[in-house]
Amino acid sequence: MRNLLEQIQGRLDELNKAERKVAEVILLNPQQATRFSIAALAQAAKVSEPTVNRFCRSFGVSGYPELKLQLAQSLASGAAYVSRAVEADDDPAAYTQKIFASAIASLDSACQQLDPQQVSRAVDMMIQARQIHFFGLGASAPVALDAQHKFFRFNLAVSAHADVLMQRMLASVAHTGDLFVIISYTGRTRELVEVARLARENGASVLGLTAAGSPLANACSLSLHIPLPEDTDIYMPMTSRIIQLTVLDVLATGMTLRRGVDFQPHLRKIKESLNASRYPIEDDDLN
């Protein structure tokens, strides 16, 4: 179950303008928010005190005192994702620490919320597939390419595509036995949702790596719901790709274990095929 900070971060887009101001003040400095009075929070967010109370009730708490208690519990858990935005005056030490802390906390949060039964079902879909297409757009496009690099090792027909027209054409000729893995941070990209629906209409299975409750998640046969809180207003998504790549590693590991020890020589052969393309470590010419 997500803690309060994660719930606030995940619902930012659902809040009205005034309530979002309250959320942004809390996420900017949750420690300080636990020390605010309701009047101080309202002033910091430039909203009225009744707006703060409505915000509290929308998250299932009776008022600001209870909200502050849950905030403190979220911070004390040690696993909460706390938004720490990079500021214009951050020095290298500050922004380095923030980026690493954000990635570590987001990975921990994703691990806790990833359903093992859903992971097992996703691995089943991949093992049973005749061929797998990985789709991604924007920041998720290189993740799809990385997936192709991982999963061709399983003696499957695997492809990756970041062009919306190619994605649509492949979905239009999909068949039973085809699996489309669609990767999207928001799950709200119209083209990807349409492709998911088209592929399913033609008998294919669709696995989504995306946000819970999103249009894409609802359009897929199965969706691995990945919480990806991050700063997206100014900076390009960073932690989203790290989590997506890690989840794909989880699925690849699941497939490897399902194939058993008899499959290991095949993987070893692929790895050893690269030896001739690399300089030996002890080569003096490289010193």
UniProtKB/Swiss-Prot annotation:
One GO molecular function term? transcription cis-regulatory region binding
Statement: the UniProt record of this protein carries the keyword Transcription: yes
Provide GO CC annotations from the record.
protein-DNA complex
Which ranges of the sequence are coiled-coil? none
Q: Which UniProt keywords apply?
A: DNA-binding, Repressor, Transcription, Transcription regulation
Record text on activity regulation: Binding of 2-keto-3-deoxy-6-phosphogluconate (KDPG) to HexR releases the repressor from its target sequences.
**Is DNA-binding included in the keywords of this UniProt record?**
yes
**One BP annotation, GO:** carbohydrate derivative metabolic process
> Which PROSITE patterns does the annotation name?
HTH_RPIR, SIS
- As annotated, the DNA-binding region falls at 38-57
Q: Where is the HTH rpiR-type domain?
A: 2-78
* Residues in SIS domain copies: 122-261
Alphabetical list of InterPro entries matching this protein: Homeodomain-like_sf (IPR009057), HTH_RpiR (IPR000281), RpiR-like (IPR047640), RpiR-like_SIS (IPR035472), SIS_dom (IPR001347), SIS_dom_sf (IPR046348), WH-like_DNA-bd_sf (IPR036388)
Record's subunit section? Monomer in solution. Binds DNA as a dimer.
What the protein does comes down to: Involved in regulation of glucose metabolism. Transcriptional repressor of the gap-1 gene and of the edd-glk-gltR-2 and zwf-pgl-eda operons. Acts by binding directly to an inverted pseudopalindromic sequence in the promoter region.
**Name of this protein:** HTH-type transcriptional regulator HexR
